[in-house]
Amino acid sequence: MLRARQGGFGSGSVLVDCCLWFNEWDALKWRLTALDSLVDRFVVVEGDKTFQGQPKPWRLTNRWSEFAAWSDRIIWEQVELSGDNWERQRQQRRAMKERAKQAHPGPDDIVVFSDVEEVWDQRMLGRWAEAIAVAGQDMRVLKPEWQRSTNWPGSIGGPWRLMESEDWQRLRDRRYELPRLESGWHLTWMGGADACREKAAAISDPKYRNVNFDWLIQHQRWVDRPLQDVGNRPEGVPETW
C-alpha cells in the first residue's frame, strides 16, 4: 500500500519514481537517498542484456541488504530485451510505464521516469501536479565538480491521468520540446575511466566505444567541449565519484 501524503503537492497524493538501471549501484543509492522524503514508491527496471546486446546477469538483488531502508517501497523489475541496440533501449524505457501500474497510481498522482543518474528535486512537483514537463538538470560530467555549459532535459513526469496514455519513449524523444523547469542534477560518466569504458560498451550509441576516457579526465574535457570546475559537489554524491 502506498502511504497517504499529508498536505500533498497540488491535487496528487502519492508520487511514483521510475528509473532504468544497468549496474550503477552508487547512482541508485544516491537517487534513493536524495528522493527519499519525496517519493512513495520507486520502480527500478533492469534488462537481461546491455543495449548493445551482450547478455548480462540479473544484478538488482545481489546487494539487497544495502537497500533495506527502501525495501518496502521498491518495485524491482527484470525485463527480457530483444531487437537492435536502440530497440532494446526503447523496450526497457517502455517497461517502466507498465511497472509503474503496479503501484496503482490514481489519476492525480505524480509519476516520473528517468535514467538512474538523472535526479530531480522538489521544484518540479507543482508543475508535475498539473501537466507533463521535463526537469532541466545541472549536468556534471566525469566528476561531480565538472559542469557542462548547458543543462540537461532529463526526468519527465506529470499526473498519471496524462502519463498513462503517453508512449514514454516518445516523450523521451521529444523532451527538448516539453515545458522545462530547472531542477536537480544529471551526473553522468562518473566513477573513473574503467566505469566509463564499461558504460560505453553497453549503451545504445556506439560512438563512445573508442573514446580515450583517461585523456578526457586528465584534460578536464568532454568529447565535444571543455568542462568547468565549479568547485561544488551535489549533496550526497558518492565519495567514489
Which functions belong to the PLM regions below?
Residues 2-4, 78, 83-101, 109, ...:
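Catalytic-site signature of metal-activated, phosphate-bearing donor transferases
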Residues 22-25, 50-51, 117-120:
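Short acidic, S/G/P-rich loop/turn micro-motifs used as interaction or catalytic elements
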Residues 31-33, 56-59, 126-129:
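Short, glycine/charged-enriched secondary-structure capping and boundary segments
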Residues 36-88:
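Acidic donor-binding segment of Leloir-type glycosyltransferases
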Residues 38, 106-107:
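Short loop/turn motifs at secondary-structure junctions
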